[in-house]
Amino acid sequence: MSEPVRTDPAQEALAALAGRSDVAFREGQREAIEALVDRRERVLVVQRTGWGKSAVYFVATRLRRLADAGPTIIVSPLLALMRDQIAAAQRAGIRAVTMNSANVADWEEVASALARDEVDVLLVSPERLNNPRFRTEQLPDLARRCGLLVVDEAHCVSDWGHDFRPDYRRIKDLLADLPPVFNVTATTETANGR
């Protein structure tokens, strides 16, 4: 009698995301995923463009959803980046949607899908996250059920430089309201002491 084949859900998620079975984790990716999924730590990933920061949070999302965690919220600064992330997530079988200024007519449908737990990833801009209506109507339930909060391009939190966005600074208020065991990851290509 042969032994059952053991599968690695993280490797399967990475392969689905990459669209090929021979893909391997880069140094540090699996460790970041394990910190998020197994130890439920807050993680900062600082790596160059193209390293695979999004693979960390998409694989972590897949594993957390397999463990019955709620959806991931990704705070992302650019609509074009959100579109790219949604396409990548969907290739991996991750149900990703967005609420942003370009799809106002879809917000009610997205909110309903979130309420029915039919969304794995919600991408929002920092401005949407801090919108008073979103904070009162959507965020309380999302914060209660959310499996992971991702602050993508976290260098935008800095209050210095050309990339400053005031609503990124307000994310700290949201983080302060979350339980200390709440999974959070931040990704950036650059980081400094600020």
Mark where each language-model region is.
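Conserved pre-motif I regulatory segment
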Residues: 2-48
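Conserved SF1/SF2 helicase motif Ia
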Residues: 46, 51, 56-95, 177-178
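Conserved phosphate-coupling serine/threonine residues in phosphotransfer and NTP-handling enzymes
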Residues: 49-51, 125, 185-187
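Conserved helix/coil segment N-terminal to the catalytic DExD/H
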Residues: 58, 103-148, 156-162
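Post-DEXD/H (motif II) to motif III coupling segment of the RecA-like Helicase ATP-binding lobe
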Residues: 140-148, 153-194
